[in-house]
Regions:
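Structural preference for solvent-exposed beta-strand-turn elements
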Residues: 21-217
Length: 217
């Protein structure tokens, strides 16, 4: 049996197998002619990350995502940056989504839903999500500049779409107001992370089953 985690005192009587919960980790690799990517994730970590994509601002966003989600993550991406950043950003989103989906193992035992409001100076962003295995993205985010640093702001939607589609998550992300493109981007990543942190949390009331009347997700 793989290493497990113990529930805090007081929660175990309501869990089908109260003694241990399997470690929720995954590693996914993806190699194409455009990108070579490895992602490892521990959903029950402490927010420690090792990120290298070749895009400084993107690294910063992914580090914030890991920290505020409480996920331990290793993200190694080598992409065709001599062309542009599109393949690197989108494909990284694909593999992170696949890693989360794999670690969630059929979404068994999780709270499933999560939401967060993140203020960042003049900006306020909201994320609500459902780990439904019905992938969808509602994107209501407008940037005031075409770039943040060297990164095209249009690529942030590509990342979030790729993540949602491959994680199996229904994600609604909206910036309610804001003017600084850096703040808009960062509050979006943090909102997604905080909402996911809620949604992936083990819910003892599920008894380790998928949180759905269908019995599966």
């Amino acid at each position: 049996m793989a290493p497990g985690r113990r529930f805090r005192s007081g929660t175990w009587p309501r869990v089908k197998d109260f003694r241990t919960v399997m470690a929720r980790t995954a590693e996914v690799r993806r190699d194409t002619k455009e990108t070579q990517i490895r992602v490892a994730v521990d959903l029950d970590g402490t927010g420690v990350s090792n990120v290298s994509t070749g895009i400084g601002f993107f690294d910063h966003m992914l580090e914030s995502f890991a920290r505020h989600g409480g996920f331990d993550m290793t993200i190694e991406t080598r992409g065709d940056l001599h062309i542009d950043m599109h393949h690197t950003v989108e494909d990284t989103g694909i593999v992170i989504g696949q890693a989360f989906n794999k670690a969630l193992d059929g979404f068994k035992g999780v709270r499933r839903f999560g939401h967060a409001y993140i203020p960042m100076d003049e900006t306020l962003t909201r994320c609500a999500l459902d780990l439904s295995n019905r992938a969808y993205l509602i994107w209501k985010v407008e940037y005031k500049t075409p770039k943040v640093g060297d990164m095209d702001t249009e690529l942030f939607k590509e990342f979030h779409h790729a993540f949602a589609m491959n994680c199996g998550a229904c994600v609604h992300l909206e910036t309610l107001y804001g003017t600084n493109s850096h703040h808009i981007a960062e509050s979006g990543f943090k909102a997604l992370a905080r909402a996911l942190r809620q949604a992936v949390e083990i819910d003892p009331k599920t008894g380790g089953l998928a949180p759905s009347t269908k019995g599966v997700l």
